[in-house]
Swiss-Prot record:
Binds to the 23S rRNA. It holds the Pfam family Ribosomal_L9_C. Keywords: Ribonucleoprotein, Ribosomal protein, RNA-binding, rRNA-binding. GO terms for biological process: translation. Part of the 50S ribosomal subunit. In stalled/collided disomes (pairs of ribosomes where the leading ribosome is stalled and a second ribosome has collided with it), bL9 in the collided ribosome contacts bS6 and uL2, while it contacts only helices of the 16S rRNA in the stalled ribosome; the inter-ribosome bridge thus formed is different from that formed between normally translating ribosomes. One of its GO terms (cellular component) is cytosolic large ribosomal subunit. The gene is rplI. InterPro entries: Ribosomal_bL9 (IPR000244), Ribosomal_bL9/RNase_H1_N (IPR009027), Ribosomal_bL9_bac/chp (IPR020594), Ribosomal_bL9_C (IPR020069), Ribosomal_bL9_C_sf (IPR036791), Ribosomal_bL9_N (IPR020070), Ribosomal_bL9_N_sf (IPR036935). This is Large ribosomal subunit protein bL9. PROSITE patterns: RIBOSOMAL_L9 (PS00651). It comes from the Bacteria. GO terms for molecular function: rRNA binding; structural constituent of ribosome.
Amino acid sequence: MKVIFLQDVKGKGKKGEVKNVADGYAHNFLIKKGLAVEANASNISALNGQKQKEKKEAIAELEQAKSLKETLEKLTVELSAKSGEGGRLFGSVTSKQITEQLQKDHNIKVDKRKLELPDGIRALGYTNVPVKLHPEVQAVLKVHVKEEA
């Protein structure tokens, strides 16, 4: 019997896959537990419609990430921090501080986990911070840390 998997089933199939399984297994386990549905014409067309919708959403997400990349690369985020001799900061500027300043100054919301800044910024001046917006799109945000008066 052909079924369409609604969820991943270990050893049998992944979500959205159409596979042939034993009739008893399909009726008594997969369909009963809501893990799969019978692969008839209406269910297959619904699956194709779902795949088309997901593809359109993925393309829209990629376009949105590309436009955000263009915007971010034109900006410079200005932050001030206390520093000692030689331009070394007391503490560091974290990704959270950068995203909050970006939200406050430019009204652009970016998740702090998308900034690839493992140790924070520990010196005055300009720093290029990579921002992973999408698996295929990475922007570079310019951050300027000034000495606090």
